[in-house]
Design a protein with these regions (language model features):
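Acidic/His-rich active-site region of diverse nucleotide-sugar glycosyltransferases
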Residues: 91-185, 190, 199
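Cell-envelope/extracellular polymer assembly enzymes that use nucleotide-activated donors
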Residues: 2-5, 33, 191
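A conserved acidic beta->alpha catalytic loop
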Residues: 23, 38-47, 63
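Glycine-rich, basic loop-to-helix element that forms the pyrophosphate-binding segment
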Residues: 61-78
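N-proximal low-complexity "stem/linker" segments adjacent to membrane-targeting elements
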Residues: 1-25
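Active-site donor/metal-binding and catalytic loop motifs
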Residues: 174, 181, 199-202, 206-227
Length: 271
């Protein structure tokens, strides 16, 4: 069995795609396959990659199915023990696969790992790092890797996570697919974080390796939500409410049940 399957989802990617693929080929760990999924690109990026990398496995979709469905299609072709889901605007450190595989091999309770995320801006690999909160709040950390926890965490970056194959299969068995395709694009990784935690899988940030990420490259690298297209904004807001519907509502329901139990089981004071 191949050790790692790298699934890349492309839709009209720009020049950063070339650097992304070069970083893959420069990995110190070599036991991997690349599954290149194209979501109906019209800018010639698919043809360029096919010419430069004939050994990749290519999956060509006629339409842009969005991130969730596109990745699900790519995952269905993966044969590796571990599966890396890689955005096209990510540059991996040369030891990325090696360190992540080592972490997964050493701990069978890990369902997902990823390295430390750094910003990639204007063609430069920067050294500041940031983490994303579950509510969409980003905390910028300008002091190297300070604040990055070496251990279990609720979630890691959704731009370059590596999942255990058995984790993927267990999610598919429970829900019917790995990513919930209702999300299309945005918050599908947060959905998985809740789901993996519920199923008892651990997630870990591997601090001995890193990856650089442009962020939102498919929507013109616009960082602020309101700088992106109206359709993207609407989808993000919809997906936030969908997350709340799926998970957070249960917390409020349980809390209200708890309060009602306290109210009706407490002794009633007599006048």
């Amino acid at each position: 069995m191949i050790k790692v399957s790298i699934v890349i989802l492309n839709w009209n990617s720009d020049n950063y795609l070339k650097d992304c693929l070069k970083a893959i080929c420069a990995q110190s760990f070599k036991d991997f396959e690349v599954i290149f999924v194209d979501n109906g690109s019209s800018n010639g990026s698919l043809e360029e990659v096919k010419k430069a990398y004939p050994t990749f496995i290519y999956v060509e979709n006629n339409l842009n199915y969005g991130f969730a469905r596109g990745m699900n299609i790519g995952i269905s072709h993966a044969q590796g023990e571990y599966v890396l889901l890689l955005n096209t605007d990510v540059y991996l450190d040369s030891n990325y696969l090696e360190e992540c595989v080592k972490a997964l091999d050493c701990d069978s309770t890990l369902g997902c790992v990823a390295g430390v995320e750094y910003p990639w801006k204007n063609g430069k690999l920067l050294q500041s790092t940031y983490s994303s909160g579950a509510l969409g709040i980003k905390l910028h950390l300008q002091l190297g890797d300070m604040g990055i926890v070496d251990g279990y965490t609720f979630g890691v970056s959704g731009s370059f996570p590596i999942y255990r194959r058995s984790t993927i299969l267990s999610v598919q068995k429970m829900t019917g697919s790995f990513f919930d395709e209702m999300f299309e694009t945005g918050w599908e990784d947060t959905d998985l974080r809740f789901l993996l935690a519920y199923m008892g899988w651990h997630t870990k940030c591997v601090v001995t390796t890193r990856a650089w990420h442009i962020g939102s490259a498919s929507v013109g690298a616009a960082k602020r939500l309101f700088d992106k297209s109206k359709s993207y904004q609407q989808r993000i807001f919809r997906n936030r409410f969908y997350i709340q519907y799926k998970y957070i509502r249960n917390i409020f329901i349980l809390w209200n049940v708890f309060l009602c139990c306290l109210l009706y089981t407490s002794p009633i004071p007599r006048d």
